[in-house]
């Protein structure tokens, strides 16, 4: 058998009070931060994705669907010009 690395066992860690004091604060905080990030719309701004009301504009009502097998780059250029 190999020697001990000196680390605490997993069972010892999850049964300690210190573990639960730290994680009872950090885990809910992460969920709240994620919810605020999405609900305030900051996620749309950071990642540059369109908001739900911006997918279809007055000038662009069709679905950007590539139908040609041999000229997809031309169709992509046409779609990108409409943005």
From Swiss-Prot:
- Taxonomically, the superkingdom here is Eukaryota
Give the molecular function GO annotations: electron transfer activity; heme binding; iron ion binding
PROSITE patterns linked to this entry: CYTOCHROME_B559 (PS00537)
Q: Which residues cross the membrane?
A: 21-35
Q: Look up the record and report any one GO term of the cellular component aspect.
A: chloroplast thylakoid membrane
Gene3D superfamilies given for it?
Photosystem II cytochrome b559, alpha subunit
Can you say where in the cell this protein is located?
Plastid, Chloroplast thylakoid membrane
Q: What Gene Ontology biological process does one annotation of this record name?
A: photosynthetic electron transport chain
A Pfam family this chain is assigned to? Cytochrom_B559
Kindly list the positions annotated as binding heme: 23
Q: What UniProt keywords apply to this chain's record, in alphabetical order? A: Chloroplast, Electron transport, Heme, Iron, Membrane, Metal-binding, Photosynthesis, Photosystem II, Plastid, Thylakoid, Transmembrane, Transmembrane helix, Transport
Q: Which cofactor does it need?
A: heme b
Cofactor stoichiometry and binding? With its partner (PsbF) binds heme. PSII binds additional chlorophylls, carotenoids and specific lipids.
Question: What is the recorded membrane topology of this protein?
Answer: Single-pass membrane protein
Q: What does this protein do?
A: This b-type cytochrome is tightly associated with the reaction center of photosystem II (PSII). PSII is a light-driven water:plastoquinone oxidoreductase that uses light energy to abstract electrons from H(2)O, generating O(2) and a proton gradient subsequently used for ATP formation. It consists of a core antenna complex that captures photons, and an electron transfer chain that converts photonic excitation into a charge separation.
Q: How does it assemble?
A: Heterodimer of an alpha subunit and a beta subunit. PSII is composed of 1 copy each of membrane proteins PsbA, PsbB, PsbC, PsbD, PsbE, PsbF, PsbH, PsbI, PsbJ, PsbK, PsbL, PsbM, PsbT, PsbX, PsbY, PsbZ, Psb30/Ycf12, at least 3 peripheral proteins of the oxygen-evolving complex and a large number of cofactors. It forms dimeric complexes.
Recorded hits in HAMAP family, A to Z, give: PSII_PsbE (MF_00642)
Under which name does UniProt file this protein?
Cytochrome b559 subunit alpha
């Amino acid at each position: 058998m190999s020697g001990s690395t000196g680390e605490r066992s997993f069972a010892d860690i999850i049964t300690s009070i210190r573990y639960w004091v730290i994680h009872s604060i950090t885990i809910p905080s992460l969920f709240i931060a994620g919810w605020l990030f999405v609900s305030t719309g900051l996620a749309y701004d950071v990642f540059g994705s369109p908001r739900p009301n911006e997918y279809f504009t007055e000038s662009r009502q069709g679905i950007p669907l590539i139908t040609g097998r041999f000229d997809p780059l031309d169709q992509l250029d046409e779609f990108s010009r409409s943005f």
